[in-house]
């Protein structure tokens, strides 16, 4: 990913009608750990089946009602990991259900490359990564300011990603380098100095 990346700020309403898994289970008095675990796993399964993409798509339509007729194309605009991110948020804090939260989502890697003009726009459709409809939609939203190019702070905080190139970062490399330097400073150098003194 580059230092600048396409993203969009979306008002996400955690609609109780869509997140219909019920409240997070708590262990009842007299309930065995196995029974509680069964109920909790069932709740997790229901949460996993929620259409999290619909929350983002609904937020985009709420921000720009003219997008209602292009609903099927909207999920192509953002990276696939964003739906899992809002799912994990609700897992950690179920009180979000029923609330509206302004969230920033990374655009899909192909959208980002298209808007950065790193793809030859004169190529025929069969050589493009995006459909003509999605290309036009991304251009329209960029012109309206719905999709913006912002500084990519996640480049420094995210680990590598095999499934979502747009969210790949350098955090893993930084941590690996840090631990290597700590090993060198606290183990390798003292051992080297001690060996030199001994010899």
Predicted feature residues:
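Alpha-helical membrane-interface segments at transmembrane helix boundaries
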Residues: 164-179, 183
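Membrane-topology segments of multi-pass transport proteins
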Residues: 2-166
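Short hydrophobic/aromatic segments of transmembrane alpha-helices and their interfaces
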Residues: 79-80, 177-178, 189-190
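Transmembrane-helix boundary motif in ABC transporter permease subunits
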Residues: 184-199
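Hydrophobic alpha-helical transmembrane segments of small proteolipidic membrane proteins, enriched
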Residues: 1-2, 182
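Generic hydrophobic, aliphatic-rich segments that mediate packing or membrane embedding
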Residues: 152, 170, 194-195
